[in-house]
Regions:
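Short, active-site-adjacent cap segments at secondary-structure transitions
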Residues: 62-66, 114-115, 436-437
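Active-site-proximal alpha-helical scaffold in enzymes
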Residues: 117-120, 124-126
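Glycine-rich phosphate-binding loops of nucleotide-dependent enzymes
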Residues: 70
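N-terminal glycine-rich phosphate-binding loop for ADP-containing cofactors
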Residues: 2-3, 8-12, 22, 75-80, ...
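Gly/Ser-rich catalytic serine loop of serine hydrolases
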Residues: 107, 111-117
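Conserved CoA-thioester-binding segment of acyl-CoA-metabolizing enzymes
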Residues: 1-58, 82, 93-96
Length: 719
């Protein structure tokens, strides 16, 4: 009856019709403009068909439909209200046409039915789900809301409170949870999904009054009073505030919309949803979070693009090695073994090897306790790690990560030794360093083209970012191989060029220096932490310094003060971190830093104020005084932003997207802000330059570059 590139309409035996989603241009089905156009054309054919007893919706892909095509969101976000509402109303009209067909409809859900994929299923009279499938409306995690009837149909199906909870959280729901909620009507085994769905459709066709009576409930108001709905919405919003503050407004918009729509008919509620959907797309959070989603895809794509020229000749890593055990080495070994890569963990000290194995075992035990691994699987993973004191144990490894102590002389010696022990001249060697020049380390090697930096962030198992540091001699093939290796480890590789601090530490320490300058002017570091955590950082800069370790902080400053002396300048009379370090305060590692630490009931460090630190700072910097919140934000994020602009202009990082993703992956930069570059774009580059000029007399870190001023004058953005 109809055959498109993304879907087909077919007449089946027994006078049933089937719309089958099968995107020929991609690995998954999604509601991009082409699919929606083809669905519109198929609906014309469907309405003209005669002697039809029912409609079945299916998918030939491993998923049903994963939702709208986010790559098309920028066009949608730039539409006027009238244009946007007209587009949303058009799709909603098409979905409602399915719901209003004069015969029963059934959706057979496999894999994932997310966003618009679930919304079209909600139009059907019945939903049959594969036991391995999940459903969900994840739009709030993108800073938006369901826009094709999800806020209207789900509460009329499962009840207001449950629907609100699902939509606000954005979390996927398993087949069992969906069944218990009443969102689906039958769970089928994957191999019998279509057959079982057809049986349900045939039964409905034989009993017309049943499906017609169920439709009546879906077309009217929700079974709840406005007062009850308002109370439920308030509870849901308070729960969001307790977790995320006011930073994710989409959840609040959804709650307000669903309360307003609960007494309306379907069509009136959908009309209300169209306008609310437009409003939420105009927020900075929507732009940031959808940009984040696209940024994640871009980072992975860039890694694959780098590897493409070598795909025909390159082989995946068969055996890896980490040189240097302990906590970091054990974490790297664990990540390799977990992803199926055999790894040699080499050290010269048995105690360090024991600690590395213990770290890997601890992480595996945690996975077993959380139900993510079976005991047998954990044992199999651990068996992939080969601890060794023998240098010859790494001979046949094709990828080596050096992770010894952060001393240049030691690393250079170890790297030269490793290179001499490898049997293949094509083996790749990397250094897990956070501060040491890759170019200088390469001087110790005979084949520097096979060498680059591979900076893992701690803890390795939890932090997604790996900085791949390109040295002057690093070959494209080496960079491609290490990016591919990082992807196999489940990490997000971002390539940066060698410079002091590389990318993340360079811009992070600009922000930390911004904090230390404030403290030297009499600011209260506790107020700074409170303001920056309210702004969205996972922890304030003083607290973060304690977590990193003040010995590490002092070392990193020394690298940047030496490497970038024109902007990273000593603070008079002293940096607060140096004062604390000189007083043998190392942060969490010895319980004394900006804060004092003790173990809580869960055995984790808990911080409290330390009057001795406050007294020390008052004696050195004067009595603490309060600063305006906006000045604190501007002084800290402004320093980070201007340093990131310089990194972009110098080619340290290739694009604003990669720059922002590095901060989100590496330091937990608030996702709802989209990254430092997007934050500056939202601020406006003219205002960013004005902010920099305001504080440039305090430090050259704040001074805007000439290229940034030109962009600002032209009304351009970093993106």
């Amino acid at each position: 009856m109809y055959q498109g590139e993304t879907l087909s309409l077919t007449r089946l035996d027994g006078d049933f019709l089937e719309i089958n989603f099968n995107n020929q241009n991609g690995s998954v089905n999604k509601f991009d403009s082409q699919t929606l156009n083809e669905l519109r054309e198929a609906m014309v054919m469907l309405k003209q068909a005669e002697s039809v007893k029912g409609l079945l919706l299916t998918s030939s892909k491993s998923v049903f439909v994963v939702g709208a095509d986010i790559t098309e969101f920028s066009v949608m976000f730039n539409a006027t209200r009238d244009e946007f509402v007209a587009q949303a109303a058009d799709v909603n009209r098409m979905f409602s046409d399915i719901e209003d067909l004069p015969y029963p409809t059934v959706a057979a859900i496999n894999g994932f039915a997310l966003g618009g994929g679930l919304e079209i299923c909600l139009t059907c009279d019945k939903r049959v789900i594969s036991s391995s499938a999940s459903i969900g409306l994840p739009e709030t995690s993108l800073g938006i809301m369901p826009g094709w009837g999800g806020t209207v149909r789900l509460p009329r199906l499962v009840g207001f409170n449950l629907a609100l909870g699902w939509i606000v959280s954005g979390a996927p729901q398993s087949a069992d949870k969906a069944m218990a909620a009443g969102a689906v009507d039958l769970i089928a085994e994957p191999n019998s999904l279509r057959k079982d769905a057809l049986t349900v459709l045939a039964d409905l066709a034989a009993d017309s009054p049943e499906f017609l009576s169920q439709r009546t409930a879906k077309l009217g108001p929700v079974s709840i009073t406005v007062q009850e709905a308002s109370a439920a919405a308030e509870d849901a919003c308070n729960a969001v505030r307790s977790r995320q503050g006011e930073n994710y407004p989409a959840a609040f918009s959804v709650a307000e919309l669903m309360v307003s729509a609960c007494e309306l008919t379907r069509d009136d509620a959908i009309s209300l949803e169209n306008h609310a959907f437009f409003d939420v797309t105009q927020t900075p959070q929507a732009r940031a979070l959808t940009g984040l989603f696209l940024g994640e895809q871009y980072v992975v794509k860039q890694a694959k693009v780098r590897n493409a020229p070598f795909a025909a000749t390159s082989q995946p890593v068969a055996c890896s090695a980490v040189i240097g055990a302990g906590i970091m080495g054990g974490g790297i070994a664990y990540q390799n073994a977990l992803k199926g890569i055999p790894i040699v963990m080499k050290d010269i000290n048995q105690a360090a090897l024991d600690l590395g194995v213990s770290e890997a075992s601890k992480l595996l035990d945690r996975g077993v306790k959380r139900g993510k691994l079976t005991e047998a699987k954990a044992e199999a993973v651990l068996s992939q790690i080969s601890p060794s004191l023998d240098g010859d144990s790494i001979t046949n490894c094709d990828m080596v990560v050096e992770a010894v102590v952060e001393l240049e002389s030691v690393k250079a010696q170890v790297l030269a030794s490793v290179e001499s022990q490898l049997s293949s001249i094509n083996s790749v060697i990397t250094s897990n360093t956070s501060t040491i020049s890759i170019n200088r380390l390469a001087d110790s090697l005979q084949r520097p083209e096979n060498f680059c930096g591979m900076h893992f962030f701690n803890p390795v198992h939890a932090m997604p970012l790996v900085e791949i540091i390109r040295g002057e001699h690093s070959s494209d093939q080496t960079i491609a191989a290490v990016c591919a290796y990082a992807l196999r480890l489940g990490k997000k590789p971002i390539v940066v060029n060698d410079c002091p601090g590389f990318l993340v530490n360079r811009v992070l320490f600009a922000a930390l220096l911004g904090m230390e300058m404030l403290i030297a002017e009499g600011a209260d570091f506790e107020q700074i932490d409170q303001v920056m955590e309210k702004w969205g950082l996972p922890m304030g800069p003083a607290y973060l310094s304690d977590v990193i370790g003040l010995d590490t902080i002092v070392h990193c400053y020394s690298v940047l003060l030496k490497g970038l002396p024109e902007r990273f300048i000593e603070i008079e009379p002293s940096r607060s971190s140096q004062v604390l370090f000189d007083g043998e305060r190392l942060g969490q590692k010895n319980g004394l830093g900006y804060y004092r630490y003790s173990k809580n009931e869960q055995g984790r460090p808990s911080k409290t104020a330390d009057t001795s630190v406050i007294e020390t700072f008052e004696n050195l910097f004067g009595k603490a005084k309060a600063f305006e919140e906006q000045e604190i934000v501007s002084r800290i994020m402004g320093a980070m932003g201007m340093e990131m602009v310089r990194c972009l202009e110098e080619g340290v990082v290739a694009s604003p997207t990669e720059a922002d993703m590095a901060l989100i992956y590496g330091i937990g930069f608030p996702s709802f802000r989209g990254g430092i570059c997007r934050w500056m774009d939202e601020l406006g580059l003219s205002d960013a330059c004005a902010m920099g000029d305001k504080y440039s007399s305090i430090s050259p870190l704040y001074a805007p570059t000439e290229a940034l001023r030109v962009k600002a004058a032209k009304g351009e953005t970093l993106y």
